């Protein structure tokens, strides 16, 4: 049987996430960076979450070639104890 009554329209509530407010673009392409240095800790900290995870490129807008370099640079900085592996020290 067909339903001829009014249908309830569902509203989509979007969650406000600070990573999605701005338009995504590659910071390294805009700055003309050729290679990401593991000693540039201020830049690397922008791409690491509080718990120590590397933020994925789909959230930051980083191009794939720079995301691979960023991944390697963060891992080198962690190995040399320039960056912590986690922020949760007990």
Curated annotation (Swiss-Prot):
Record carries keyword rRNA-binding: yes
Record GO terms (molecular function): small ribosomal subunit rRNA binding; structural constituent of ribosome
Keyword entries, A-Z: Ribonucleoprotein, Ribosomal protein, RNA-binding, rRNA-binding
A GO CC term attached to the entry: cytosolic small ribosomal subunit
InterPro entries: Ribosomal_bS18, Ribosomal_bS18_CS, Ribosomal_bS18_sf
GO biological process, one term: translation
Pfam family, one: Ribosomal_S18
UniProt KW RNA-binding keyword: yes
Function: Binds as a heterodimer with protein bS6 to the central domain of the 16S rRNA, where it helps stabilize the platform of the 30S subunit.
Subunit structure and binding partners: Part of the 30S ribosomal subunit. Forms a tight heterodimer with protein bS6.
Family, as annotated: Belongs to the bacterial ribosomal protein bS18 family.
NCBIfam families: S18 (TIGR00165)
Protein name, per record: Small ribosomal subunit protein bS18
Lineage: Bacteria, Pseudomonadati, Pseudomonadota, Betaproteobacteria, Burkholderiales
